[in-house]
């Protein structure tokens, strides 16, 4: 069943949550915004003013001063719009790597924050509430044994966080209730934190992607393709963007008849066009052929028009992402696939990529073997049993086949799965990443995500479950995570071809869940417009593009005209340790890669300056020599001057 209303309560159900009061800190988290202004809370100011006279007045006030300072040290530095909701002292975090540690647990409107002053340096755990999948109580009031009474939070980013409370302290109930309230605001009729976040960045990331500019970059419109506004009010297809690129000889009225034959009205539309051959990548959903094998003359004519727009080939490939058995099964639900008898000069290829439920189960198995401990003796067999890398291989291999048909075969391709918003997005975006060097730049990749994932209706709200306590929802699936994993695999095989680094990819995934930014909220462009996200929330790209040096690959060399052909075999794929096992301190490199990147970037900039200086010097010498050679008077002048 479709869940079209799952975005309606993200930000407009209640009056906006209050901004930080004088009782809360209003400074920026160093993990998100190092340049924000830090301000003291009223409590900190008042404690300082009390302590001014305390030194000469009362031992009790000195104790109060020290207690206030300790409390201030234990509190998190808050983001603009963030405020503290609950705090519990004398809580024990059961760290699976370094053992139990006692400290203060704080719940804010944005994060779960634990800090212990018992270790040097202090132990800090900082997790956004958006990353929490579920919260469970452990033990009862009569539970015996140390640390047997508390809470466990299961997270979407592989982690499980376990906290022990003292039964007599009665803090567990309060923390549990506040976590359930603020980690799942949609389920409680509250706005997501993205609607409260008030940070201002130099660049507005919401303006990064302009579809007209992106299509113009590709040479669209041209004699074969046009931009239509038929979906301006999202009436043709409510999960497609307002602007669509379609064959120039197909009128808008005919598009409506094609839409009636495609699942959810998702007609074939252009994603990318080859600058030389004019071969295209188009995307859509499955045809509604059903068990009876229905046909649509308009749909057949439409695909013929796509093929005819490419004079280099008299054939078109239809890549169906599904296993063939699944595609056949979809006929019973009214769906199905294109018959080669009905579609002249079309070849149908099944790519055997499994559905969202298989992928969700695969990630669950992966989590079991990587967190909290890794069983060394059976590591390879355990990893194989998850089938995670096998799924990554099939996605990469499918995208590679698409890119190869377009580049080497100079043939246009049509890509779809069932509804065209999960596996289709994986395949088109990865193929475009292989074909077009622009998408391998930082801003180009952001445009790719905005275009192929966000504007074309990948259901982020349902797949991630932003602010929703229903952790067992069958619509949840790591589709976008798999795409980013595939991108990382490509960066490993082509380390100089991408302008962005690993930290860039991890940052995107962290904020896929965090609900700090509005970028990944809602299920479609239409829903984001209704929620007015560009006005009410901050874009993730605003944050990233304000500090590009953090996300830049120092090894990058511009290969804009190169097509990448990654090897999609199990021998060349590896588990992304930097993401899936990053919480294990034993897996961290001794030298932080992030700081090493910055050093290399600084060194590269220094060397580039020297190269430019030498080039200018050579140019000046060359100019001077040519002038002396061409002018006899100038040749004599130095001699006369010497005399």
From Swiss-Prot:
Expression tissues: Expressed in sciatic nerve and in Schwann cells (at protein level). Detected in adult dorsal root ganglia, neurons of the central nervous system, motor neurons, cell soma and neurites of sensory neurons, olfactory bulb, cerebellum and hippocampus.
Keywords: Cell projection, Coiled coil, Cytoplasm, Endosome, Hydrolase, Lipid metabolism, Membrane, Phosphoprotein
Reactions mediated catalytically: a 1,2-diacyl-sn-glycero-3-phospho-(1D-myo-inositol-3,5-bisphosphate) + H2O = a 1,2-diacyl-sn-glycero-3-phospho-(1D-myo-inositol-5-phosphate) + phosphate; a 1,2-diacyl-sn-glycero-3-phospho-(1D-myo-inositol-3-phosphate) + H2O = a 1,2-diacyl-sn-glycero-3-phospho-(1D-myo-inositol) + phosphate; 1,2-dioctanoyl-sn-glycero-3-phospho-(1-D-myo-inositol-3-phosphate) + H2O = 1,2-dioctanoyl-sn-glycero-3-phospho-(1D-myo-inositol) + phosphate; 1,2-dioctanoyl-sn-glycero-3-phospho-(1D-myo-inositol-3,5-bisphosphate) + H2O = 1,2-dioctanoyl-sn-glycero-3-phospho-(1D-myo-inositol-5-phosphate) + phosphate
Top-level class of the enzyme under EC nomenclature: hydrolase
Coiled-coil blocks: 593-627
Keyword Membrane: yes
GO BP annotation list: dendritic spine maintenance; myelin assembly; myelination; negative regulation of excitatory postsynaptic potential; negative regulation of myelination; negative regulation of receptor catabolic process; negative regulation of receptor internalization; neuron development
Residues binding a 1,2-diacyl-sn-glycero-3-phospho-(1D-myo-inositol-3-phosphate): 330, 355-356, 418-423, 463
EC number(s) from the headed UniProt entry: 3.1.3.95
Subcellular localization, as worded in the UniProt entry: Cytoplasm; Early endosome membrane; Cytoplasm, Perinuclear region; Cell projection, Axon
Domain of life of the organism encoding this protein: Eukaryota
Xref: SUPFAM superfamilies: (Phosphotyrosine protein) phosphatases II, PH domain-like
SMART domains in the record: GRAM, PTPc_motif
Keyword Cytoplasm: yes
Positions of modified residues (Phosphoserine): 6, 9, 58
Post-translational modification: Phosphorylation at Ser-58 decreases MTMR2 localization to endocytic vesicular structures.
Descriptive protein name: Phosphatidylinositol-3,5-bisphosphate 3-phosphatase MTMR2
Species in which this protein is naturally found: Mus musculus
